[in-house]
């Protein structure tokens, strides 16, 4: 940044469109510096302290990776303001408290990983939060709710698909027994009625087939 002072005493600021970098022992000049950052990756840098609330001012941020550091404290509530965010990784830190409910309102958030922290409470129930696999939330002894199996009411949450499958099987069994009972009842009644008619009355066609009763002469 370069600043100049004019004759009237006011100061004006200008920014260079390049920067000198030294990367792996090599000197290079990076031109066309971006003034709008869309991705930040601070992973694996042993950073300490709390994540500042000012992180929520980066509303154009698309990807944020703070994994494998030593961040502590709560997840900033201001992260709900990152309306363009698509990927959020805060795994393997020392974060505590609950997951902000506002994160479930981030429409573009397709990936989130907060595993291996010290988070607790119920996971916000929203498509963006519960869509990822349970591995994205594991390693937090106090977390509960979907997609984890631990219920917030002290019991394990049964797998949804398995539960539906078992219910369908039970319904099928009930329907099969109802069908058997429905067919069995009228069938027995009809059979008994025919037997009674034959026993009490012999129609002509039946007499012709089996013949009239004849007494044997002794």
Swiss-Prot record:
Pfam families: LRR_1. Residues 200-218 are cytoplasmic. The chain crosses the membrane at residues 179-199. Glycans are attached at residues 65, 113. GO terms for cellular component: plasma membrane. Keywords: Cell membrane, Glycoprotein, Leucine-rich repeat, Membrane, Receptor, Repeat, Transmembrane, Transmembrane helix. InterPro entries: Leu-rich_rpt, LRR_dom_sf. LRR repeats lie at residues 34-58, 59-82, 83-106, 108-131. It is a single-pass type I membrane protein. This is Putative receptor like protein 25.
